Amino acid sequence: MMVHNYCAPENVTAPPHVSRVTQYNKRGIRMISKVTWRVAWESDLTNGDHAELSDFFKSVYGATGAFNALPFAGGRSWAGARPELRGIAYDESGVAAHMGVLRRFIKVGGEQIAVAELGLYGVRRDLEGLGIGHSTLAMLPVLKALGVPFAFGCFRNELRIHFQRFCRNGKGAIVDNVNIKSTQPDIYPDLPPTKIEKKAAVILPLTETLDRWPEGVDIERNGPEL
């Protein structure tokens, strides 16, 4: 049986993380942009922060379909479960990238385990080279300080290549065809209260090794997706 000692928020700190990424101006000229990462607890964000993130998500997720931008209306900066912690990248144009984190217990093959769930991935569309790998690398010291054995996140197929690159050399593992059971983010009279989706998931070892991850492809969140 695993024993988990969670860190208090004040024990979780991160040094400034600066990335240099490629952009192109309106003339197609290659430029290098400096991006600075901020790690913020949810209760430290202001209404202005949420409004700025809301606009960011509407732009990023709306590009894949107007329906995907709807959860972020009215200054809302989350779609399902609300993050506990956020990694936010800024450049001279504002929010450049985002990754949300939420500690929770999930069930994997019927076995309960504590994880730091990753979600709300986003990169501004005009940036090139600031992928999920950069986001994960910037957040890794913080994730390791949270006192949970693994980080876990589901992802769309378009993000597979980014996670595959990051997981090289044993940094993590990708599990395909996982059956994820989640609650709906709200009450919908015409829908059941839970849903099951088949997705791919990434597992990152934090305080345990990958061989300690439970076997099984059935995962229960016991809550909405981050």
From Swiss-Prot:
- GO cellular component: a single term: cytosol
List its EC numbers.
Answer: 2.3.1.-
Q: Does the keyword Acyltransferase apply?
A: yes
Pfam families listed in its UniProt record: NodA
Q: Subcellular location, in the record's words?
A: Cytoplasm
Q: Name one GO molecular function term.
A: acyltransferase activity
Q: Which residues form a coiled coil?
A: none
What is this enzyme's class at the first EC digit? transferase
Q: Its principal location?
A: cytoplasm
Briefly state the protein's biological role: N-acyltransferase required for nodulation. Acts in the production of a small, heat-stable compound (Nod) that stimulates mitosis in various plant protoplasts.
Return the protein name.
Answer: Nodulation protein A
The record lists the organism as Azorhizobium caulinodans (strain ATCC 43989 / DSM 5975 / JCM 20966 / LMG 6465 / NBRC 14845 / NCIMB 13405 / ORS 571)
Name of the gene:
nodA
